Amino acid sequence: MASKVLPQALLVIPSNHSLQCPPLKKQLGFPIDSNRRFSLSSNCRSNLMVSRASSNLFSSNFSSIFSFPARNSFVVRSEAEDSSDAPAESVAVVAEEELPVESEAEAEERPPRQQRVKLGDIMGILNKKAVHAAEELRPVPGIRTGDIVQIRLEVPENKRRLSVYKGIVISRQNAGIHTTIRIRRIIAGVGVEIVFPLYSPNIKEIKVVSHRKVRKARLYYLRDKLPRLSTFK
């Protein structure tokens, strides 16, 4: 390490051949004769020559150590860049050509996404199917509030005999297959209300006797009115 640092320190000394060592009279404090001065000057020149030679050797060693890998790295980089130019372009072109084909194939292979069916939708579908099946067995006329209807009902407890009920429809509650109607009539001066499921299999026939126009959807106010308003022919 010291051998490498010493030439760097010696490089600071100027390289002029005519330069002589500075007088040592002031430094040493006593006079020096010419022979000794000449010997000192020769010694200084020899030191200068040694320092110059050592600096040249050091510079040559330094350049040989540090410049050779730099040249090799530069050559390697240039070769890598030259060799990778053409394949990079070809790879890019191939990738651009293959991307649309893959996207089209994926679009064709993917099946259409099915929408999620909620529980309420399922119940609605089942109600529609049940209503459609019940209407095929027995057609149901359009019944509105205020109509006078006649219903033929089969009673299982009465040896399946048919009973006829007639009255005014005071309300209708729509609930799919569970739709019901409420009928009111006067029996022995007393108002009687009966609820019938509209799609019940025990109902064999529903007949609309007459239609009446009313303003309200539910005629519950007839309960407080006179019985003659709830009678019909």
UniProtKB/Swiss-Prot annotation:
Residues 1-77 form a transit peptide. GO terms for biological process: translation. Its main location: plastid. It holds the Pfam family Ribosomal_L19. One of its GO terms (molecular function) is rRNA binding. It is found in: Plastid, Chloroplast. One of its GO terms (cellular component) is ribonucleoprotein complex. Keywords: Chloroplast, Plastid, Ribonucleoprotein, Ribosomal protein, RNA-binding, rRNA-binding, Transit peptide. The keyword Signal does not apply. Belongs to the bacterial ribosomal protein bL19 family. Component of the chloroplast ribosome (chloro-ribosome), a dedicated translation machinery responsible for the synthesis of chloroplast genome-encoded proteins, including proteins of the transcription and translation machinery and components of the photosynthetic apparatus. Component of the chloroplast large ribosomal subunit (LSU). Mature 70S chloroplast ribosomes of higher plants consist of a small (30S) and a large (50S) subunit. The 30S small subunit contains 1 molecule of ribosomal RNA (16S rRNA) and 24 different proteins. The 50S large subunit contains 3 rRNA molecules (23S, 5S and 4.5S rRNA) and 33 different proteins. This is Large ribosomal subunit protein bL19c. The lineage of its organism: Eukaryota, Viridiplantae, Streptophyta, Embryophyta, Tracheophyta. The gene is RPL19.
